[in-house]
Design a protein with these regions (language model features):
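Short beta-strand segments that buttress and anchor functional surface loops
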Residues: 121-130
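Bacterial N-terminal signal peptides that target proteins for export
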Residues: 1-7
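N-terminal signal peptide c-region/cleavage motif recognized by signal peptidases
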Residues: 16-18
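A solvent-exposed, acidic/Ser-Thr-rich amphipathic alpha-helical stretch
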Residues: 62-118, 133
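Short, low-complexity N-terminal intrinsically disordered segments enriched in polar/charged residues
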Residues: 21-63, 67, 71, 173-178
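Short beta-strand edge/turn micro-motifs at domain boundaries
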Residues: 139-171
Length: 178
């Protein structure tokens, strides 16, 4: 009887696991609508981060970094250096300038502002390195602190130290980052 119950439990769990498929995060239909706020300062901060991302980060127009970033910019991602000029030098090699899109290319879920902080939440599709056939979704965040001059002074994200130019454990699909 115990063997039958044990086999039944294994069968139920084996069948149930695929049925509990992850629901992918849903990107916002209208990114510009996410910039609205009753508080003008919060709306300005969200717009500043939105424009920085489109123009400098995705668009590769690092020549405009001073318009968006403080000189003493602090980077909390362990894979990138701090400092506006080191950011410019790094991304100048990575991203040639291209036309600026009207919206962020990454699939933005929401943009939230609180005081001097703006957080952008986005959907990312990743492949498990240990099981390459397993593709799943995560919700990523990028958080920025805006200083008294209205410039991006700090950036945080959940990135871990990359190995051989790749994130540990998973591979991001960066269709939007081209």
């Amino acid at each position: 009887m115990r063997t039958t119950a044990g086999l039944l439990a294994v069968f139920v769990l084996t069948v149930a696991v695929p049925a509990m498929a992850q629901v992918a995060p849903t990107p916002a239909a209208d990114q510009v609508a996410l910039l609205a706020s009753d508080n003008p300062r919060l709306a300005r901060n969200k717009r500043h981060v939105f424009d920085f991302w489109r123009i400098v980060y995705e668009g590769g127009h690092v020549d405009q970094a001073a318009k968006y970033m403080a000189e003493g910019y602090v980077q909390h991602n362990p894979n990138l250096p701090s400092g506006r000029q080191t950011f410019v030098d790094f991304f100048r090699k990575q991203r040639p300038p291209k036309p600026v899109a009207e919206r962020m290319k990454m699939p933005v879920i929401t943009i939230v502002a609180d005081g001097d902080y703006v957080s952008v939440f986005s959907a990312r599709k990743v492949r498990d390195r240990a099981n390459p056939s397993h593709v799943y979704y995560i919700t990523w965040f990028d958080m920025f602190r805006i200083d008294a001059q209205g410039l991006i002074a700090e950036h945080w994200d959940p990135s871990e130290m990359w190995v051989d130019g790749k994130p540990p454990g998973a591979e991001f699909f960066a269709e939007w980052d081209k």
